[in-house]
Amino acid sequence: MRTESGCFNYNNGIRIHFRSGGSGPRTLVFLHGFAASHTTWEDIVPFFPADRFRIILMDMKGFGLSAKPRDGAYSIEEQARIVRSFIREERLSQVTLIGHSLGGGVALRACLQAIAEKEPFPVERLVLMDCAAYPQRLPKFFRRLKTPILGPLLIRVIPVKIMVQRTVEKVFYDQSLITAERFERYVRYFRGRGLAYTMRASVRCIRPEEYEHIGEQYRLISLPALIIWGEQDVIVKQKTGRRLHEDLPASRLTIIERCGHNPHEERPAETYAAMEDFLSGLHLESQGNGP
């Protein structure tokens, strides 16, 4: 599917970049994970028929081609407010939010905010991939990023290619899929201006104590939800997906075999197959690998 760039101005001038394509009646809004961008979806987008779906690939604030203001406001709550504002201002309807990792957490928070504020929210379904839904211990590198002195130093001292190598080795289960082209795509992105600040600011906004009782809130979300998880994910373990399946009352869970943290990159065909019937609204009941 061919996509074109667009821009949305949030809160008096914060530029939010997105790419969109397709002319179908159902709108799919994709939300990437931490330190990623709209390019993370390049492997799976071609599977979506342009006559059935309209696709919007958002760059969240501070990531990709979106603005990176040094305002410290990079919490999941803030990102969720931006998503809601985007949906409202663009007058979207029949929306499915598709979130990976951090983006899944943002999708969930957007739903909870709309429920709390009793605001009409034209989201019909959720697709949550290896979702950052609960408090968990951050990887060592991210914990160090939070420190005032060591964090900025790490970003400057560690060569980008080493940082990328360590990242993709943890993200991908099948190391043969880390092609030179994919590796260089990650390197180009990590060298982007302003990303170092965004990464530090985002990590500093993570406060696990605020999410201690989040499971009880998720039970308020009645939307049909498809939870997709890589069987060998070492970033957000499979048990998190099973817990989320228990907490979301209208959810189904599909486990993608021989797959790490990024099913949409590592197993795009299998991931799309898991999504196809769900997005068409044919059924919700659990099938295949899901319980």
Where are these regions (language model features)?
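Active-site loop/oxyanion-hole signature of alpha/beta-hydrolase fold enzymes
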Residues: 11, 57-102, 119, 273
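Flexible "cap/lid" loop of the alpha/beta hydrolase fold
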Residues: 112, 121-156
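Acidic catalytic loop of the alpha/beta-hydrolase fold
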Residues: 232-236
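Conserved alpha/beta-hydrolase catalytic His-Asp/Glu region
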Residues: 157-220
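Conserved HGGG/HGGXW glycine-rich cap/lid loop of the alpha/beta-hydrolase fold
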Residues: 20-65
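Alpha/beta-hydrolase fold catalytic core
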Residues: 1-28, 50-53, 81-84, 88, ...
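Short beta-strand/loop motif that positions the catalytic acidic residue
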Residues: 221, 227-229
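Catalytic active-site module of serine/aspartate enzymes centered on a nucleophile-bearing elbow/loop
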Residues: 251-291
